[in-house]
Amino acid sequence: MTQLYTYIRLLGACLFIISHVQGQNLDSMLHGTGMKSDLDQKKPENGVTLAPEDTLPFLKCYCSGHCPDDAINNTCITNGHCFAIIEEDDQGETTLTSGCMKYEGSDFQCKDSPKAQLRRTIECCRTNLCNQYLQPTLPPVVIGPFFDGSIRWLVVLISMAVCIVAMIIFSSCFCYKHYCKSISSRGRYNRDLEQDEAFIPVGESLKDLIDQSQSSGSGSGLPLLVQRTIAKQIQMVRQVGKGRYGEVWMGKWRGEKVAVKVFFTTEEASWFRETEIYQTVLMRHENILGFIAADIKGTGSWTQLYLITDYHENGSLYDFLKCATLDTRALLKLAYSAACGLCHLHTEIYGTQGKPAIAHRDLKSKNILIKKNGSCCIADLGLAVKFNSDTNEVDIPLNTRVGTKRYMAPEVLDESLNKNHFQPYIMADIYSFGLIIWEMARRCITGGIVEEYQLPYYNMVPSDPSYEDMREVVCVKRLRPIVSNRWNSDECLRAVLKLMSECWAHNPASRLTALRIKKTLAKMVESQDVKI
C-alpha cells in the first residue's frame, strides 16, 4: 500500500513538472538553482515519506554567468544537475557559461534541442564541480524552413521578373513590327490609289454610280467600299462654310465638284445620325440633298468625320435671299420644291423595301440649299427623328444638339410637346416651314416694291435670342412675323400669306400637313404656269 502511494506521488510530480516545463524556457530553469545552505541530505521525520527530490544529495557546481546572488567563489549548490552551455548571439559571437540547474525539469532541459533562431548547446553532469571540465560545441548550421521559404520566394520573384521583361521585349517587337507595317501600307496608299479604281471603273461619274445603286442595290445608297474609296480620292479645294457642327468644303472627285462636310469630333453623334438617315432605304429624292458617301479618316492622333454630298454653288436659301430678289414664279418654285422635299421626309412608304416617316427638327433657311435650276433641297438631317408604324416606335437620336431657337414651335419652347408620339414632331416642322415661306415672300417683288431680307422675329428678339426671349414672344404674346400691307394687294402673295398663317398656327392640330401644303402650292404653280 505504501509503495502504491509512493508511485502515485511520483506520477503527480512528473505531470506537474511536464505541465510547467512546457511553458518555461531554458533561461528560467537555469536562473532557479535550488541553492541550499548545506550539503546534508534531508532526514525524514517519523511516519513521513519524502519525495524523490528530497532524497537526492546536493551537488556543488562551478558557476560563470549564471551565478546566484549568494554564490561563494563561483560555486553554487543544487539537487539537480551541473551544466555548461555555449550560445551564439545575433552578431555571431559565442559565449560559454556554467551554473546550477534545479531538479525540477532538469532532465528535459539537459536534452534541449537547438532552435533555428538561436544556436546553442547544453551539457549536464551530476558530480561536484564536474561542469568545469565540460566543453560543449555549437551544432552545425541547419537551413530552417523560414530560410527555405525565403529562397523559394526569391526564385519566384526572379522568375516573374524574367517573364515580365520577356513580355515587354515581345510586345515592343510586335508594336514595332505593326508600326513598320502601317508606315509601309500608308506609303503604298498613295501609289495604289489607281488600284482603288477597280471598284470604280474609269469613266464612271457619280450620277452613274448612284443610278446603278438605285436600280440594282437596296436603295440605301452606294456600297460602303465604294463610299470609302470615293472619300479617299477626294481632293479638298476650299472652305465654303463653317457652323457649330464643323466645316463645309468644296472638293473634287475625278473633276466633279462635291461638298464635304467635316464634323468636329465632338459632333460624332450628329455625323452618325445624318449618315444613318441619308442611307435609309428610298431616302433619295430630288428635293433632299443628294448623299454620296460617309467615312471616318484619321491617323491615330486626329480623326475627321466626312459626309460627302452633292455640291450646290448657290449656297443656302439664307445666303441666296440676302443677295437676290424673286418674282412670283421664282417664289412658287422655291416654296413648292421645298414642300416636296418636306413631304417626302414626312411620308412613310410601306413595303418590304419601305421608308420610315422622318421629321427634320431643325428646319430653317440655312438648312435649305438652292440648286442650279432654282429649286430647293433640304439638308442637315443630324437631328432627324424616324418613325416606323410597324413597331410604333419613335427613334430619337442620342444627340446633345438642339434645334435653332428662332424657328422653334410654341410647343417646343414651352416644353409641352409629347416626345413619345411622332405626330408632334411633324407639326413642329410645319411651324418652321411657315417661317421659311415668310422669308421667301419678303424678297418677292410686286409693283416694284420689295423688303430687305430679315430673319423671322428680327424686330422682336435679339440677334441671338434665348429660350425666354422666344417663349415670351411666341407663346405668351402669341406674336408672329410682321406682314407687309402690299401682300394683300397681290393675288399670289395673298395666297402665300394664307398658307403660311395656317402653317404657324399656335395650335399644332390646326396646322396644315406637308402633303396639303404641297398640293396647295402645286395648284398655284399650275395657275401661274411655272415650269418646275
Swiss-Prot record:
The family this protein is said to belong to = Belongs to the protein kinase superfamily. TKL Ser/Thr protein kinase family. TGFB receptor subfamily.
Carbohydrate-modified residues are N73
Task: Tell me, in a sentence or two, what this protein's role is.
Answer: On ligand binding, forms a receptor complex consisting of two type II and two type I transmembrane serine/threonine kinases. Type II receptors phosphorylate and activate type I receptors which autophosphorylate, then bind and activate SMAD transcriptional regulators. Receptor for BMP2, BMP4, GDF5 and GDF6. Positively regulates chondrocyte differentiation through GDF5 interaction. Mediates induction of adipogenesis by GDF6. May promote the expression of HAMP, potentially via its interaction with BMP2.
Is Signal set as a keyword in this record? yes
Q: How is it modified after translation?
A: Glycosylated.
State the organism named in the record: Mus musculus
Annotated Protein kinase domain ranges read 234-525
Q: Where would you find the membrane-spanning parts of this chain?
A: 153-176
GO CC annotation terms, alphabetical: caveola; cell surface; dendrite; external side of plasma membrane; neuronal cell body
Gene from which this protein is expressed:
Bmpr1a
Protein name per Swiss-Prot or TrEMBL: Bone morphogenetic protein receptor type-1A
Pfam families linked: Activin_recp, Pkinase, TGF_beta_GS
Q: Which residues form the active site?
A: D362
Q: Reported effect of changing N373Q?
A: Reduced glycosylation and increased protein stability
**What are its E.C. numbers?**
2.7.11.30
SMART domains documented for this protein: GS, S_TKc
